């Protein structure tokens, strides 16, 4: 059987971070292989509105940074339901003279922001205290503005830290923009006042997006190769194929050429796993688990309740429709694998619900996905890519 080769677009998470850092730098940066996701388009529009010069050509951006010096601005900025934009922009506008109001979707208004706002109120003192168990985006947003603060910043994180991989991703990208981040103990970061150096940066492939094609290989009998993988990536989702290997999949990696190949076994095995470092691929693994033999437990999912929808409840509802038994707690889901049946899947306005359940169509041709257009939030070309592997 032939190998189906796929590439995925640039990471939305890294694109949005690169836009912020380039905007705060002291010169012109070129960002290539950007995500053309809806969220990244919202980020570009928002940064332009606060005075940053950005020129977009295809999947490239030319950004003229202002060194963190903004003119007075009054007005509204629509961030829709883009979580990274809302959190990252809140940190930046706390430094801008004037009154700026972020217009958010109904769901975005329900997602946590208070802890970030509380921390930003003391940011000019040079020392802040922030909880680490709500959203890693709070910490990333504060880290990225720290170099332009007069006193720099000491960030003290209380409680356990969730989604550490996203914080590591932020630190790694800051280094690429010439920023030094000191780590003092597990929950303390020191970022001195310093210049953010403009750079030419190529955005890595989106490994959350790649997970759907890895999962497709796991359940379909097809051999699928995802190309342009950066094996030095800080994206937590890099280890997703390793989880599939534990479930019995055949995995091949070529670090030099940058690809990962996945082919599923005749019978998938259950798995017990903590996915706190890669929560965006939990729904993908849940679909694979639905076809596995035995009960799979996926833990470390406390943040899923606060995403585009309550993803744990949404998973339970839709898996039940497919005649798959599952149980949920505040931070986990247990799935009894079996023979999923065709159903009409509600996506709850959540791009990851749509893409994860679409994978099941490879085994259940009659499965229907409601509001399939929601994928544009992170992966506008998803359907084109998926239809290619169905040929």
Regions found by a protein language model. Name each.
Residues 1-391:
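Structural preference for solvent-exposed beta-strand-turn elements
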């Amino acid at each position: 059987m032939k190998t189906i080769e796929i590439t995925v677009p640039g990471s939305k998470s890294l694109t949005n971070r690169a836009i912020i850092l380039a905007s705060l730098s002291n010169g012109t940066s070129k960002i290539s292989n950007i995500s053309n996701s809806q969220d990244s388009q919202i980020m570009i529009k928002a940064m332009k509105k606060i005075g940053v010069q950005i020129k977009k050509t295809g999947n490239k951006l030319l950004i003229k940074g202002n060194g963190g010096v903004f003119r007075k601005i009054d007005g509204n900025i629509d961030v829709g339901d883009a979580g990274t934009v809302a959190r990252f922009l809140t940190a930046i506008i706390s430094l801008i003279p004037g009154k700026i109001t972020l217009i958010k979707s109904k769901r975005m208004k329900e997602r946590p922001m208070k802890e970030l706002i509380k921390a930003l109120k003391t940011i000019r003192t040079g020392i802040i205290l922030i909880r680490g168990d709500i959203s890693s985006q709070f910490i990333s947003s504060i880290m990225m503005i720290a170099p332009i603060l007069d006193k720099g910043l000491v960030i003290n994180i209380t409680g356990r830290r969730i989604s550490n991989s996203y914080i590591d991703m932020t630190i790694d990208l800051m280094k690429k923009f010439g920023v030094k981040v000191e780590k003092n103990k597990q929950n303390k970061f020191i970022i001195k006042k310093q210049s953010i150096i403009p750079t030419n940066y190529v955005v890595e492939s989106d490994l959350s997006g790649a997970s759907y094609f890895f999962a497709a290989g796991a359940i379909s009998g097809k051999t699928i190769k995802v190309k342009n993988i950066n094996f030095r990536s800080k994206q937590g989702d890099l280890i997703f194929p390793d989880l599939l290997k534990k479930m019995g999949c055949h995995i091949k990696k070529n670090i030099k050429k940058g690809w990962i190949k996945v082919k599923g076994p005749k019978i998938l095995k259950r798995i017990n796993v903590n996915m706190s470092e890669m929560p965006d691929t939990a729904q993908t693994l849940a679909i694979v688990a639905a076809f596995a033999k035995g009960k799979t437990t996926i833990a470390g999912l406390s943040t899923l309740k606060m995403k585009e929808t309550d993803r744990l409840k949404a998973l339970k509802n839709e898996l039940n429709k497919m005649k798959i038994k599952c149980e949920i707690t505040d931070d986990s889901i247990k799935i009894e694998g079996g023979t999923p049946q065709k159903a009409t899947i509600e996506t709850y306005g959540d791009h990851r619900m749509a893409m994860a359940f679409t994978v099941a169509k490879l085994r259940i041709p009659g499965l229907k996905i409601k509001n399939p257009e929601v994928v544009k939030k992170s992966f506008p070309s998803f359907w084109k890519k998926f239809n290619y592997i169905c040929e």
